Amino acid sequence: MFADSIRAAVENPGPSLRSGCGAVSLTDRKYPARAASWVILIRMDAVTLTRQLVDIESISGNEAPVGNYLYGELCRLGYQTIKMPVEGNRFNVYATSAEHPHPAVVFSTHMDTVPPFIPSSEDAGRIYGRGSCDAKGIIAAQVATAERLRQQGIYVGLLFLVGEERDSLGAQIANEYLADGHPSGCRFLVNGEPTENHIALASKGTLRVEVTATGRMAHSAYPELGESAIDKLIPALTRLRAMPLPSDPEIGPCTLNIGLIEGGRAPNVIPDYAHADLLYRLVGSSEDLRQQIRTTAGDRVEVTFPLELPFLRLRIVDGLPTMIAKFTTDIPKLTNWGEPLLLGPGSIHVAHTDGEYIEKQQLAESIDLYCQIAKHLLEQPK
């Protein structure tokens, strides 16, 4: 089957993927009927490229197979392509044109997906499968954009990252890559996420909060001999849920999700441990909110803040429809890559669902839109 063949190819890469640029193409070996011209494929059929990418499982931590695939094909197209080491066998893919190795505009998105893997399928109007809109359809659109522009003598970069769905580690490493002295020239970063081709005015931030309670185990028949951690945690969470949150008249309210609660050992044991993971979507600075959370949670629990991605206002392009991204992206970790813009095909409302899809028409329109934006940005004075 199509999906089985491509998974086998990337999980057991032959010489083409091990030897780097200029090698025989994986596509030639596995899809001779489709591979008469990879250039025609990405210019004419982003649908096919999207399906190929979706059919390579790349749940966060396992991005190497799809990274190898993209690296090999971008090399074959003639791009100067590098694997930017992240950790273990994980790497980002960065591609530029030999004619202009330090592009002013770079298109970026992520290669990883949330679980579980769902292979691709399609009907007349949609492509389905895990990552179809978040964000493998966007990868296909950005590669097609770079090729279309290159045929017009306009050169942009492509930056495909690992780990966005988990901790943005790939973005952090990409930022350090430039900080370590690698020349860029990048003035604008066009980050792709599913915004239905609307350009984002702003992106909400993320504040992850861990609330932990400890107690003392005892037989449940003698609760007075123990101390229930769950009895400490539940009131703290109840107070946090009732706590007023800040709001922005343009962006909307800060929101809270209690995403995970765990604790206890058995129904007949007084629990000595309880824990909750919370996620706040920020609409401004977190400084006052952090203090409010600590005070509201109280002194019977421990509160920590393991992750924050700040709220951002973003550059827009006049004449394009706008939206507010209530989700977070890699952008806060890519500060060395120029002024950020955020848009892409697909709807965030179906991302991470078992029915994830991308509209074929929206995919095609995004290539036109990305090309227009790149040209507009390149016209801006330095």
Which positions does each model-derived feature cover?
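Acidic/His- and Gly-rich active-site-bordering loop/insert found
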Residues: I40-S132, L342
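Acidic/histidine-rich catalytic neighborhood of metal-dependent amide-processing enzymes
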Residues: A140-R208, D248-P249
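Short beta-strand segments
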Residues: S108-T109, L159-L161, L189-E193, T212-T214, ...
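Secretory-pathway/membrane protein signature
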Residues: S16, P32-R43, Q52, L77-G78, ...
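Acidic-glycine-rich active-site phosphate/pyrophosphate-binding loop
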Residues: M111-D123, G185-C186, A202-T212
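Metal-dependent amide/peptide-bond hydrolase catalytic core
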Residues: I82-K83, P194, L201-A202, R208-K382
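A cross-taxon signal for low-complexity, glycine/charged-rich
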Residues: A3-D4, A9-G14, S19-A23, T27, ...
